[in-house]
UniProtKB/Swiss-Prot annotation:
The keyword rRNA processing does not apply. It comes from the Bacteria. Keywords: Cytoplasm, GTP-binding, Hydrolase, Nucleotide-binding, Ribonucleoprotein, RNA-binding, Signal recognition particle. The lineage of its organism: Bacteria, Pseudomonadati, Pseudomonadota, Alphaproteobacteria, Rickettsiales. This is Signal recognition particle protein. Composed of three domains: the N-terminal N domain, which is responsible for interactions with the ribosome, the central G domain, which binds GTP, and the C-terminal M domain, which binds the RNA and the signal sequence of the RNC. It is found in: Cytoplasm. One of its GO terms (molecular function) is 7S RNA binding.
Length: 449
């Protein structure tokens, strides 16, 4: 989501670091460049103004001007201020589950914000924490909205309140309250109706629901793709409903990222979760330091390790590592890596969590290693014999023609796969010889140099 902002800030940081001793004029110029980068990313103007003022005040301090590496000191200040911009106390960011059961959560937001998906993701997260969860759809306006929630709930074996056609939202709430008591649910998540825009009727209905439900949390789902409109939306909901926290959806989208940097600062309400993709497991607890590090191209190694640990088969990973140490990496290993990459959201998603990735993200985009390409490559590799997978060098022109026919593709696509395999094979072998500390310190850009 922050690709453009990350790349623009990386260029500014490179200038600062390469300058050696910094003058006040150079710091002023850097602040102007940062201001432009934030404006282009749809960060709200009041946020930019206060952020730049804080950074500049600290950057002009004597300890920075006289430091051995003033450029690095300013980058450190920017990192700290970005954390301050995004952060809330730990007690605020954690989901409040301390009420007497059933604990009620009210999900609000505009239509199309990803609210229903976020409700289901939250339900799955709580189910995995051994909570008995009931999902309740109050959206009687959007066609098939109630059915959508029921399908999502059923896909992960979570109960949803049975649908009664023609029932009004407030009547659904009363039925849900009774069901929660009878069946001893620990958590009830109410998915309210959205609108294409904020209106008086929508807010009055949501307020009436809130009075009956008495939720422990009122969570506003904000679409990160909406830019500065997200701030207006967040303010309106907060004024009328007094929200307790925010969930930012579609953070994996190709948006400018300004919403994430603005909504918390403007509303003074904590960001609790980041939602990405359609998979119900794609919900992560918000961590200001991790996100700030990702935006500033310092990486988010903790998220990377957590995600990898939940997906990668440890035994297979150890086998691959042992082979790499011996300088071996065949097409079976390549296929295994591609499948893991696909599960983790694609190559771009992985790289965005590693330090130094900002400088090579365009290069990675051009490689087009998305999920569909990986599926096509999987079909090509599975059309090869075991001997060909273990010894790619034997794949001559006639073998390539046979493989292409077996995979239902062209020889050109087979050639592209073999070329990418060779490049990644060299990169993997290079990485296996590097000191892990140096790899993290220097960033993954070194692998491509």
């Amino acid at each position: 989501m922050f690709k453009t902002l990350t790349q623009n800030l990386t260029k500014i940081f490179d200038k600062l670091v390469s300058s050696g001793i910094l003058t006040e004029a150079q710091i002023d110029a850097a602040m102007r460049d940062i201001r432009v980068a934030l404006l282009e990313s749809d960060v709200a103007l009041p946020v930019i103004k206060d952020f730049i003022a804080e950074v500049k005040q600290k950057a002009l301090g004597q300890e920075v001007i006289k430091s051995v590496s003033p450029g690095q000191m300013i980058i450190k200040i920017i990192h700290e201020e970005m954390i301050n911009l995004l952060a809330s106390s730990e007690s605020e960011t954690k989901l409040n589950l301390n009420s007497k059961p059933p604990v009620n959560f009210l999900m609000v937001g505009l239509q199309g914000s990803g609210k229903t998906t976020a409700s289901s993701k939250l339900a799955l997260r709580l189910k995995n924490q051994n909570k008995k969860v009931l999902l309740v759809s109050l959206d009687t306006y959007r066609p098939a909205a109630q059915e959508q929630l029921a399908i999502l709930a059923n896909s992960v074996q979570i109960n949803s309140l049975p649908i009664v056609q023609g029932e009004k939202p407030l009547d659904i709430v009363k039925r849900a309250i009774a069901e929660a008591k009878i069946s001893a649910y620990g958590v009830v998540i109410y998915d309210t109706a959205g609108r294409t825009q904020i209106d008086k009727e929508m807010m009055e209905e949501a307020l009436a629901i809130k009075k009956i439900v008495e939720p422990t949390e009122t969570l506003l789902v904000i679409d990160s793709m909406t830019g500065q409109d997200a701030v207006v939306t967040a303010n309106s909901f907060n004024e009328k409903l007094e929200i307790s926290g925010l969930i930012l959806s579609r953070i994996d989208g190709d948006s400018k990222g300004g919403a994430a940097l603005s909504v918390k600062y403007i509303t003074k309400k904590p960001i609790k979760f980041l939602s990405s993709g359609e998979k119900l497991t794609d919900l992560e607890e918000f961590d200001a330091e991790r996100l700030a590090s990702r935006i500033l191209d310092m990486g988010d190694i903790i998220s990377f390790v957590e995600k990898a640990a939940s997906i990668v088969d440890r035994e297979e990973a150890e086998k691959t590592a042992a082979k790499l140490k011996k300088g071996k990496f065949d097409l079976n290993d390549y296929l295994q890596q591609m499948r893991s990459i696909k599960k983790m959201g694609g190559f771009g998603s992985i790289l965005s969590m590693l330090p130094g990735s900002g400088k090579i993200m365009d290069q990675i985009d051009q490689s087009k290693l998305n999920s569909k390409i990986i599926e096509h490559q999987e079909a090509i590799i599975l059309s090869m014999t075991l001997k060909e997978r273990e010894n790619p060098d034997i794949i001559n022109a006639s073998r390539r023609k046979r493989i292409a026919a077996g995979a239902g593709t062209t020889v050109q696509k087979v050639n592209i796969l073999l070329k990418q395999y060779k490049q990644i094979s060299e990169m993997m072998k290079k990485a296996s010889k590097m000191n892990p500390k140096n790899l993290l310190r220097n960033g993954i850009g070194k692998l491509f140099s």
